[in-house]
Amino acid sequence: QAGIEHGLRPRLHANQLTDGGALQLAAKFKCASADHATFASEADLAAAAESGTVLTLLPSIEFSTRQPYPDARRYFEAGVTVAIASDCNPGSGFSNSIPFCLAIAVRDMHFTVDQALWAATEGGAKALEREDVGHLRPGARADFSILDAPSYRYLVYRPGVQQIGAVFCEGELIASNPQPYSVFA
C-alpha cells in the first residue's frame, strides 16, 4: 500500500500453477504486470484488460514444469497487453533464451511470429513501464540486434542457431561477429 501511495505500481507473481485468484488481485490494485498468468479465466482476462495490467507469459517455465501452455489467442481477444519473458531461475526455468521462448510461444501458445516478437520487445517494455525501450522510434534508446538471417522470422523458427550479426546499445555498435556462422550462405 505504501508503494502505491508513492506512485509505484506493484507487480505480481500470479496464477502459475493454478487459478488462485491472483489475477483479480492484480487487476484490483492496477498492477503494472502480473507474471506467469498461466491459468486465467475469462473474468481474469477482462479484469486485466480493464485495469491495464500487462500479463507476462513465460513459455520456458511451462516447458520446464510441464504445465499446460496458455492459449494466447484468448488473451489477445480479451484485449490484454501481453509480454513474453524467460524467467530464467534455478528452480523452474532453466533457459534464458528468448528465441527459445519465442519458438514455444508460436508453436504451442498460438502466437503469430509478429505477436510473439512484439510481446518480447514492446510488450516487455510496457510491463516495465518503459517508453524508451522495446521499439525503434524517435526518442527511443535504439537497443537492437541485426540478424544474420534472410528474415526476422528465422529468430523464431531457428531458435538454436546463432543468428546475431551485430548488437547496438543506445545506437552504438557494441558487438559484432565479423565472420558470423551462417547456415544461409
Segment roles from a protein language model:
Residues 2-4, 70, 145:
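Short, electropositive alpha-helical surface patch
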Residues 9, 19-135, 159, 174:
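Active-site-adjacent C-terminal substructures of enzyme catalytic domains
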Residues 120, 141-185:
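C-terminal cap of metal-dependent C-N hydrolases
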Residues 12, 84-86, 142, 147:
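Active-site flanking residues adjacent to catalytic metal/cofactor-binding acidic residues
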